[in-house]
């Protein structure tokens, strides 16, 4: 489960503008990859609780009560920053999710297809484990000799270097490098989101929670 790097309360710059019901929409965005995860509502108490605990709290309009995201499922949202839009009537919460955000089990409340490209691509590659290696190129790499999958990365990287600088060919060969790198990671049982963790930490960002289904 992700943990806040600091136990200090968050600070919100500006005064939020609540609607006639005392609510403000709060958009939750993944800190690392920028994907929009969910939208919920906060009243002043939920906002103050979020800032104080660095965990996402919301107001249920149907139940008329406060609720903490992930209190039951364990899929909490650790909040690293809270910002108001230019009009002060919409909140943006930068978060690290501890698992799928939607109650349906999807990565986002708009479905997995709305999730980050890397996650979707990794899932597609992972699904090829069950495919027939004789008819699936990816399955052949996943079940074949490791040297074969590793060699493809070198071959595609060479094509990048040989392509005309700035050309479409160079772009396409670079895409092949990334794709085959993901295949090798999947073959070795490495969640590619761990790569994002490393890059995030190098940028001074909090690492995202790893999703065990990629």
Predicted features, each with a name:
Residues 1-174, 178-214:
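Flexible "arm" and connector segments at domain edges
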């Amino acid at each position: 489960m992700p943990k806040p790097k600091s136990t200090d309360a968050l600070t919100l710059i500006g005064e939020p503008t609540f609607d006639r019901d005392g609510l403000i929409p709060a958009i939750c965005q993944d800190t690392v990859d920028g994907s929009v995860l969910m939208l919920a509502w906060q009243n002043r108490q939920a906002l103050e609780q979020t800032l104080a605990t660095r965990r996402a709290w919301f107001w249920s309009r149907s139940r008329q009560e406060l609720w903490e995201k992930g209190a039951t499922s364990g899929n909490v949202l650790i909040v690293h920053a809270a910002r108001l839009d230019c009009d002060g009537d919409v909140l943006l919460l930068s978060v690290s999710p501890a698992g799928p955000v939607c109650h349906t089990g999807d990565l986002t409340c708009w479905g997995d297809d709305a999730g980050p490209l890397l996650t979707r691509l990794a899932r597609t590659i992972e699904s090829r484990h069950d495919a027939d290696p004789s008819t699936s190129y990816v399955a052949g790499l996943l079940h074949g000799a490791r040297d074969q999958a590793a060699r493809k990365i070198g071959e595609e990287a060479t094509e990048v270097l040989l392509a005309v600088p700035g050309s479409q060919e160079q772009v396409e060969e670079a895409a092949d490098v990334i794709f085959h790198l993901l295949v090798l990671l999947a073959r070795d049982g490495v969640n590619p989101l761990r790569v994002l963790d490393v890059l995030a930490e190098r940028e001074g960002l909090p690492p995202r929670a790893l999703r065990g289904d990629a």
